[in-house]
Amino acid sequence: MHLESQAFAEADAGLVGMMGMRGRGMGGMMGGRSNVPNGTPLRVMTLRTRARQGAAFRVPERLSSFDAAWAPRAGAPIRRVPLTFQRMEWLLDGRTFAMGDVAPEETVAAGSTQLWEFENLANPMGMEAAHPIHIHGRQFRVIDRTGGRARNALRAGIVDAGWRDTVLVLPGETVRVQVPFTRHPGLYLYHCHILEHEDMGMMRNFRVT
């Protein structure tokens, strides 16, 4: 836990700055401010229980399994996914989100395995931002990290160990992940998990056929 916390603390250029604005987000760049003062209580929703439900269940003896002998698959196809900022939009592979839109390279065959290479590129505005990239419906393994400013805990592979569904890509970094598309055909999302970035377009569909 300490090492993972250290890794995120070391990523201040990206996570603390969010959009490279040192915590001010797009409001810091635009000069805007929230009209809700910090600490103000907000009613988000009200939940009402209409009937008492039984709570009888058993926890499985084994929740999951882990293959300690796992190794990257040689010869897996590589898909490059640049992470960029243009025209006030965050982009995945040069595209923003469109409902139901799937590019040819975003269509994969069930049972296949691919390497997805996320490259966090500089942009003309000079903004640096970390992107925690989340892939729906799949778990993957981080193969390697190159470029960027070294973060000790990340470089040591501690945070990246094991099966993941989200990977942090720091400014200037290229991170390769191996994704097995083993089952469950359908339409899925992959996106940046920073809400500002996602809402500004950094989300796409992929289809497993």
Where on the chain are the PLM-derived regions?
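Extended terminal and domain-junction accessory segments
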Residues: 1-131, 137-140, 180-187, 191-209
